[in-house]
Amino acid sequence: MTEAEKIEVRDITRIERIGAHSHIRGLGLDDVLEARAVSQGMVGQKDARRAAGVVVQMVREGKIAGRCILLAGEPSTGKTAIAVGMAQALGTETPFTSMSGSEIYSLEMSKTEALSQALRKSIGVRIKEETEIIEGEVVEIQIERPATGTGQKVGKVTLKTTEMETNYDLGNKIIECFMKEKIQAGDVITIDKASGKVNKLGRSFTRARDYDATGAQTRFVQCPEGELQKRKEVVHTVTLHEIDVINSRTHGFLALFSGDTGEIKQEVRDQINNKVLEWREEGKAEINPGVLFIDEVHMLDIECFSYLNRALESDMAPVVVMATNRGITRIRGTNYRSPHGIPIDLLDRMIIIRTVPYSEKEVKEILKIRCEEEDCVMHPDALTILTRIATDTSLRYAIQLITTANLVCRRRKATEVNTEDVKKVYSLFLDENRSSKILKEYQDDYMFSEITEKEEDFGIGGGSKRRLDIGAGDAEAMEH
């Protein structure tokens, strides 16, 4: 074999990130909003999924806005999974913004501004406009360049459809667009007359035999029918936040790319609201209320809850879905306790969807789906042991053991994860219960001891007791 024949071909590996909820494709409901047992990556939680399906249906119809839904349940019961399923079910047309309750705390902008931006990111505006386009197959292009090499270029293009053929004179700007898109004879193109934008749709089927080999990106399309000049309705979908950023004088549209939007004045927002409502009255635009999902909502403080009370009553408000795993706990920023750490007046505006713990059978099904998602072949006995670990500890811990067990399996050059692999990673990585047990056993060896309830009420820790042992003389000196 000669040197020229020794060619090594390597396939380019496509990197796909596998997230905690990347296996979810929707809510797993049928046409009458009944939950299937296992569908679209969702398992169990039939009542919660059915309730979420009703909310999705209402959002699709666009009839409701400013409603608030709370997903409440114990940890590892699929609250975030239901929210991800809602986002997948709504599709890309409906704005869906996801954020955590702790994301609003920043030194650059106020808490209410962060919430306001999140709310306006969740409201879409469909703007309709009619444009005049020229659509046809390129028969011939002639471009005349100046002899000196500098100056304006002029040219002609011949376009045809199945019914007609016409010549067009080209200006310098259109010629540059043609050269940028690499337009040649046989291409099917569209030219926007208003903006001068040239779009290449593909190659004509009549030119399919021009080349013996073509790249994968080459697309063959039919020659257009009818007139060359057509009127076409174009729909642009933008969010209110994007319109805010573009109209904010301090930053302008470049802030859309940098992400550094800063605080936007309320006057700008009011003007945009009035303009969008005016467009809606004229039939130029449609308002599409989306969904704002706030995870760990108990991390918001009393000022944020007060702001949400007013924001939810606005006409320009999306459907807000919140999730929390807290029971009766303290409202952040106050000394009062309430259910889920949310004030009673805001709870009164919510409808609450409860999630229940998964059964052992459902946990096994979830682990099986995660094994498929992570390309891990697991023996049935190993899956049974992993299910038992999940019921004794937590579902998240068991899911994390799948990847580590798969790595141990590959280390011994096997293709199937067995019980020994699962036992090995279980002994290597501690769960929360075993870790707490070790900490209680060896807590005196650690730097700080456990804080008792009495110490917590006084706001002191184990290492602060010595500071309270003030002598009588010191106390008198402090009084004077």
Curated annotation (Swiss-Prot):
Protein localization: Nucleus
Top class in the EC scheme: hydrolase
Protein name, UniProt field: RuvB-like helicase 2
Origin species: Drosophila pseudoobscura pseudoobscura
Leader peptide range in chain numbering: none
Keywords from the named record: ATP-binding, Chromatin regulator, DNA damage, DNA repair, Helicase, Hydrolase, Nucleotide-binding, Nucleus, Repressor, Transcription, Transcription regulation
Positions that bind ATP: G73, E74, P75, S76, T77, G78, K79, T80
Function, as annotated: Acts as a transcriptional coactivator in Wg signaling caused by altered arm signaling. Pont and rept interfere antagonistically with nuclear arm signaling function, and are required to enhance or reduce arm activity, respectively. Also an essential cofactor for the normal function of Myc; required for cellular proliferation and growth.
